[in-house]
Amino acid sequence: MHILVVSVNYRTAPVEFREKLTFQAAEIERAMTTLQNQKSVLENVIVSTCNRTEIYAVVDQLHTGRYYIKKFLADWFQLEIEEVAPYLTIFEQDGAIDHLFRVTCGLDSMVVGETQILGQIKDSFLEAQQVKATGTIFNELFKQVITLAKRAHSETTIGESAMSVSYAAVELGKKIFGELTDCHVLILGAGKMGELALQNLYGSGARKVTVMNRTLSKAEVMAEKYMGHAKSLSELQCALLEADILISSTGASEYVITKEMMTKVEKMRSGRPLFMVDIAVPRDIDPAIDELEGSFLYDIDDLQGVVEANRAERLKEAEKIQFMIEEEIVLFKTWLSTLGVVPLISALRDKALAIQSETMVSLERKIPNLSDREKKVISKHTKSIINQLLKDPILVAKEIAAEEGASEKLALFAKIFDLETEEVESRAEEVEHKRVWTPSVPSL
């Protein structure tokens, strides 16, 4: 089995391509179910955010797995593989594990150290579990990754100097306008990104805030928290007349603000400039609007300059987290190396249980007058004896599994206990396709 990551991210693909390969939240579970049925794919988790679409997979063959994941992406978004391939980055084995840790800890984010990605990874993993797209390997790996990411943010100061993309958008506005106290700010979208932007705007002194959303009630709830006003998107054109700063993140599949709409609005703004930041993927604002004289449009890729301001400080903390990641990878690989011994241990326990069961049958035949309580006591104690006898051999088997040349030693182990090869292979197949995480083999 192999671990594989196929990634489209802000480092390798411009926003106009990333928005073509963005999974809508409502289709993620269906996408993972579809991918799970692809040849070679044993487990998968799909993560899709404004800056990346990534497929994490356990595959039985690397070459076949790579091909069918690329094909899945192309088919899902109705593109040719040749169109998609140039923008893909592929990580394998140790590189794939390291990438997942770095992404979840915020080290691979446009804004190094941001915490939003941790929640997004966790949500994607839980969705994958719900549709049974994860199994033994990913259930353990993602558990370790999420735990480490939380520890990294609590044990370092990377979160103190890190910024979200929403914060970067606000910082850009402050560079242009200075104080935001007198600026009329318009927020399009009442989701997480919109609220993060509003939090940062409020913290920077903005008080004239309007929140707009397709569902007015959501806009009202968010606006009330920050003493702003809420309006329906049907009033968008009027709101654009009043705004000085616009930050948009609606998650709509088509442009919310078109060049035609903005051309009409500009004529009524009496030459007042409008600073627009589009942090949505797919984009909310028609990029052609930047051609208009009074509209200054920035998209998510333009925020990189603002992000760089605090980068040096964050990178110092990132080095500490990378060291933590490397330690955690060693622990995961040790666990992974012992996974192959589970079928052997299971076969050994099954053989011991069969002997105990045969002994109980023989005992009941020789002493037919045993009460039910006496049978239970005898059964419990014979199982206890077996568990104590097997404890040390099982620990040794696990240690051997983590060593070089383990296969020959484990073969000798199987021979000593007269374990049938077919039985062990059958157990291995069960483990390989298991869909529920089991951290250890249960005792008898």
From Swiss-Prot:
Enzymatic reactions: (S)-4-amino-5-oxopentanoate + tRNA(Glu) + NADP(+) = L-glutamyl-tRNA(Glu) + NADPH + H(+)
EC number(s) recorded for this UniProt protein: 1.2.1.70
Keywords: NADP, Oxidoreductase, Porphyrin biosynthesis
Annotated positions binding substrate: 49-52, 109, 114-116, 120
Any Pfam family the entry gives: GlutR_N
Molecular function via GO: glutamyl-tRNA reductase activity; NADP binding
UniProt keyword Oxidoreductase present: yes
Disulfide bonds: none
Site entry: Important for activity: 99
UniProt record, GO biological process: protoporphyrinogen IX biosynthetic process
Catalytic-site annotation from UniProt: 50
Binding-site positions, NADP(+): 189-194
InterPro entries for the chain: 4pyrrol_synth_GluRdtase (IPR000343), 4pyrrol_synth_GluRdtase_dimer (IPR015896), 4pyrrol_synth_GluRdtase_N (IPR015895), GluRdtase_CS (IPR018214), GluRdtase_dimer_dom_sf (IPR036453), GluRdtase_N_sf (IPR036343), NAD(P)-bd_dom_sf (IPR036291), Shikm_DH/Glu-tRNA_Rdtase (IPR006151)
Miscellaneous comment in the UniProt entry for this protein: During catalysis, the active site Cys acts as a nucleophile attacking the alpha-carbonyl group of tRNA-bound glutamate with the formation of a thioester intermediate between enzyme and glutamate, and the concomitant release of tRNA(Glu). The thioester intermediate is finally reduced by direct hydride transfer from NADPH, to form the product GSA.
Domain notes: Possesses an unusual extended V-shaped dimeric structure with each monomer consisting of three distinct domains arranged along a curved 'spinal' alpha-helix. The N-terminal catalytic domain specifically recognizes the glutamate moiety of the substrate. The second domain is the NADPH-binding domain, and the third C-terminal domain is responsible for dimerization.
Family listed: Belongs to the glutamyl-tRNA reductase family.
Self-association state and partner proteins as the record states: Homodimer.
Function: Catalyzes the NADPH-dependent reduction of glutamyl-tRNA(Glu) to glutamate 1-semialdehyde (GSA).
UniProt protein name: Glutamyl-tRNA reductase
